[in-house]
Every structure is written in C-alpha cells, then in structure tokens.
C-alpha cells in the first residue's frame, strides 16, 4: 500500500517471490503518478494448473450419493449410543469464469468445487449439543471424498459434539483483566487503536481528535 496525500494505491500478487514484490512496488509508483483513477497493468500469464477442470455435477449418480450418505450415517451412529441425530450433505459446484479487461484481454478459468459437511447431535442426561465439521476443495468427488477423508470428518464432528456436551459455561459479566506484554496488546489496538491512528485524527473522524492532553481512559489503566 502506498499513500500520497489523499490518494491510496494498492498492489497485490498471488505469487510469493522477490520479483512479484518488486513488480508490485513498481506498479504502485506508476499508479500514484497516473492521473487516471485506475492503472491498467497487464497480468503476467501462467500455465500453472492448480486443479483439474472436472465437472463434479456429472461425477456421481444420485443413487451412489445416497449409498455413501447411508454409509456415513451408519458409521457415525456406531461411534456412541448418545448420538441422536446425524446430518450429512454434499455440495458440488462447477463455474466457468471469464474476465474481459478494458484493453480487450480475455482470461478464463474453469473452477470445480466439492464440499462435504457432517453435523452430529449428542444427548446426555437431557442435555443436547451439536458438533459440525466439513471439508472441501477444487477436486472431484472421487478424488476427494474417499473413505479415509469422510471418516475423519465424521470423527471430528462427533469429537466437537462430545466436547460441547461436557463443557462448562464460561464466566460472564464484568471482571478485572490483566494484560501482559506481547500479543495481548492486540486487544487494546482493536478496542481503541484505530481511533488513535493519524489519518482519522487528521480528518477529524476519530472520537479522540479533539482530546489532546485529556484523559481518555479510566484511572485503572496504567
């Protein structure tokens, strides 16, 4: 990100390399110098194939999906008698994306996507809890949803439900909090830090912009 006056320019890359960082910085310079609202920079071409162009919608028949779901239901319920409900579902998606840039350049992509989710309801002494887990990826059903994968999903959904069933309510209400050095500072930053940033105070959009040399926190904050 680069800032010049009221102009902010962003540049990003999907590739983590020294060259991509260098190109991004050069793009920022060109954008800030441009008088137009956007900078039309050519996209580097790549033949890297991260996933196949299979269509998961044609991958399995309805009956084969029902058979797998029945196996999933049977396997999950066999894990413990306190399991009262099992819900499993598949999601298949096939997208064809085409981007036409202002200069006439055309870029297209075929994107398959499969998703598998399991929800497990457990009950003990009248108390019910739910565990939900799922996986997904740009692959076909056959490549992704094998026995090993879906059993892991069922196991994890049941584990989460069991943890919830045996969990205790977290303490609530007002309480004293002591923050040490290091990562706890993020809590302070998210609570008030953005309002203390220079741009917001310069533009007088922050609640603190006119409170210079005045107390803005309770006496307990040191």
State the predicted function of each range.
Residues 1, 10-12, 117-119, 176-178, ...:
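Structured core elements
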Residues 1-31:
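N-terminal cap/recognition module
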Residues 1-4, 108-139:
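Short beta-strand elements
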Residues 3, 8, 85, 102, ...:
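Broad gene-expression machinery/nucleic-acid interaction feature
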Residues 3, 119-123, 178-180, 189, ...:
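Generic beta-strand/beta-sheet core signal
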Residues 19-110, 142-185, 206-209:
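Acidic low-complexity segments
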Residues 106-119, 195-205:
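Acidic, His- and aromatic-enriched active-site or binding-groove loops in soluble protein domains
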Residues 186, 191-222:
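Conserved, structured C-terminal
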């Amino acid at each position: 990100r680069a800032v010049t006056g009221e102009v902010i320019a962003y540049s990003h890359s999907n590739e983590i390399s020294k060259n991509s960082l260098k190109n991004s910085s050069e793009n920022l310079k060109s954008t800030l110098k441009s008088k137009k609202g956007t900078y039309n920079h050519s996209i580097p071409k790549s033949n890297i194939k991260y996933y196949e162009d299979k269509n998961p919608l044609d991958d399995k028949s309805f009956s084969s999906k029902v058979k797998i779901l029945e196996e999933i239901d049977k396997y999950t319920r066999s894990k413990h008698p306190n399991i009262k409900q099992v819900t499993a579902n598949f999601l298949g998606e096939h997208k064809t994306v085409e981007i036409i840039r202002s200069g006439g350049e055309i870029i297209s992509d075929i994107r398959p996507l499969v998703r598998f989710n399991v929800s497990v309801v457990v009950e003990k002494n009248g108390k019910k809890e739910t565990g939900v887990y799922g996986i997904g990826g740009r692959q076909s059903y056959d490549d992704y949803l094998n026995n090993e994968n879906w059993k892991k999903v069922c196991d994890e959904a049941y584990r989460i439900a069991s943890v919830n069933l045996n969990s205790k309510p977290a303490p609530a209400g007002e309480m004293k909090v002591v923050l040490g050095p290091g990562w706890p500072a993020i809590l302070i930053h998210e609570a008030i830090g953005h309002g203390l940033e220079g741009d917001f105070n310069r533009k007088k959009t922050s609640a603190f912009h006119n409170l210079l040399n005045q107390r803005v926190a309770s006496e307990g904050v040191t």
